[in-house]
Each structure stands twice: as C-alpha cells, then as structure tokens.
Regions:
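Short, flexible loop/turn elements at secondary-structure junctions
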Residues: 16-21, 100-102, 136-141, 162-165
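Polysaccharide-binding and catalytic clefts of secreted carbohydrate-active enzymes
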Residues: 1-122
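Active-site clefts of carbohydrate-active enzymes
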Residues: 60-68, 95-111, 147-175, 179-183, ...
Length: 238
C-alpha cells in the first residue's frame, strides 16, 4: 500500500516492524512447538552471536535460567521479524527498525517484555534479523542518557521512536543529536501534550534544522558534543 501511494513524494522514510515485541509472564515460549525447537540444533549465526565454543542444542549452549531462555526467545523473535522485513523490502526498500521496551527497574526476563531488541541482546538480534536497520529504545524511565548510550553504537545508529513527553524533551532532542548524532528523537503522544511541552520540542527541532549544515559537515568527526543537565546529571565533563 505504501509503495503504491507514496512512490513519488516518499513521505514515509522508515518503517517500524512490530511494536515493543517481547515475552511477558515468562522468559520464553513453552508450547510444544517451542520445546521442539529448544531441543533442536542451534543455528551457526546464533552460536557466533553468543560466542559459544561448544554444544549443539540450545540446552547445551545457553544457561538454564531466565536469561538463557530470553536469548533463545530473542533469536526466534528476530527470525520472525526478519521474515517480515525481508519480504517488505522486496516491495519497498527503505530502512526498517524494531523498538524495545526497556528492561528497567531491576526486573528479570518475563517481568519486562523480554527477548525484544534490547541492548544486551543486540548481537543476537543483528544475527537473526539482518534486514532490520536499527534497534531502537523507547525511553520512559529515568536514566535517559544511560539508555541512549546503550543504543548509540558503531553498528546501531541511535533512533529514539518513543520517549516520555515532558519539559525536558526539547533538551533531550538536542542532546541526542549533538552527543550521539541520532537519526531522530520522537516524544510519545506529542499531540496530546501541553502547549509548553510542545513549544520546547518545536524550538529544539527548529534549532536542529538551523544547525543541520554544520552538523552534517562535522558528522563522525568527534567534534560535536551534546550536554544534558538535569536533576539526574548535574555536570558533564567534555
């Protein structure tokens, strides 16, 4: 549908595949089909992703706990998303990303939407879903800078598709662009936010647009930095 109606203006520049995919209440699926897969041979791509030196079945390669179960589930979630993305790109070849709900507040796999495209599972997701261009964090919890840093990686440009819309949203947009050369920053439900919150974001976007030539000139040179000071971070050393 998008390919047919947007083939001239190219309004759609990126597509999100699934939304905060993950497993809740348990770390992995225990259906008969999943148990059969768990007793099967681990694909080579997964062995490389977890740097396994021995073992052939999932039970031999992974730890027998919630974290091992999460890794198993992450690979197969990734394979499912890969099939969707690969097929979609045969019709419309534009960047595609998957977003993640964060594993915050000390929760264990199954207590948060586990096995999604989380930072500690990025190697598994990259191995399982090579047609996915970005793994993207939805940041609603405290520690904004720390969450952003986990996704701003050489093999994963930072894009924040969801973040709590708040008075700091404008500053966070400027920080992600300056410090991490982010692809984008998108506060959630901005249309329902207060006029003051919208004003901060609009002003930040306007500044970024004005700075775009300068930012592009110095992109990947290490000469552009971002500073974010708030109640959580009271100082930054550059």
């Amino acid at each position: 549908h998008i390919a047919s109606i947007d083939n001239e203006d190219h309004t759609v520049i990126m597509i999100q595949v699934e939304n905060e995919i993950g497993m809740l209440e348990d770390a992995r699926d225990h259906s008969p089909q999943a148990e059969k897969a768990y007793s099967g041979v681990v694909p080579n791509a997964m062995l490389k992703a977890v740097k396994a030196k021995s073992g052939s079945t999932w039970g031999e390669v992974l730890t027998h706990d919630a974290y091992g179960d999460e890794q198993f589930m992450a690979y197969w979630y990734g394979r499912y998303v890969e099939r969707l993305a690969a097929e979609a790109k045969t019709v419309l070849d534009i960047p595609m990303f998957v977003n993640a709900a964060m594993n915050s507040r000390g929760r264990r796999p199954g207590e948060y939407p586990s096995a999604g495209p989380l930072a500690h599972l990025k190697d598994i997701w990259h191995a399982a879903a090579p047609h996915i261009d970005l793994l993207a964090p939805d940041i609603y919890d405290t520690g904004f800078k720390q969450w952003a840093e986990r996704y701003a990686l050489p093999d994963n440009p930072l894009f924040i598709p969801e973040s709590r819309c708040c008075p700091n949203s404008g500053a966070r947009a400027l920080y992600t662009m300056g410090e991490h050369e982010a692809v984008g920053f998108s506060p959630f439900a901005i249309a329902q936010s207060s006029a003051g919150e919208q004003r901060e974001v609009r002003q930040a976007y306007s500044i970024i647009d004005e700075l775009r030539p300068l930012l592009m000139t110095h992109r990947a040179t290490g000469r552009v930095r971002g500073v974010l000071l708030d109640a959580e971070d009271r100082e930054t050393v550059i």
